[in-house]
């Protein structure tokens, strides 16, 4: 992925860097969200009958996420935002499918901007 740094020079801890990530909304003005629909979550929920029943009603967006490009070096920090929509499949509330990092030592911090769970 492309670097969000202004240059390839080492990170300047005194000056920091600017990234396109709004800490109030968690969104980016330049990167479109990726959407995960219920049909893409097949096999993730325990109650298969409830899943099929919900899918027959429609194919809602379960969640969407912004993923900002980062340098893929050990210790770099990933920035992004997940928006989890309200909904249930059987007794389970909607959840994210998960992901993996190509560099295992990539840090992440999750925090809730609004809503409750």
Task: Mark where each language-model region is.
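Active-site region of the double-stranded beta-helix
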Residues: 27-117
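Eukaryotic intrinsically disordered, low-complexity regions enriched in proline/serine/threonine/glycine
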Residues: 1-39
């Amino acid at each position: 992925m492309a670097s969000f740094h202004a240059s390839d020079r080492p990170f300047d801890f005194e000056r920091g860097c600017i990234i396109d990530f709004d800490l109030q909304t968690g969104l980016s003005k330049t990167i479109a969200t990726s959407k995960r629909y219920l049909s893409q979550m097949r096999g993730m929920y325990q109650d298969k009958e409830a899943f099929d029943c919900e899918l027959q009603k429609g194919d809602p967006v379960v969640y969407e996420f912004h993923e900002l490009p980062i340098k893929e070096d050990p210790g770099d920090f990933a920035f992004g935002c997940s928006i989890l929509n309200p909904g249930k499949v059987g007794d389970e509330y909607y959840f994210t499918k998960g992901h993996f990092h190509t560099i295992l030592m990539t840090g992440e911090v999750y925090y809730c901007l609004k809503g409750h769970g």
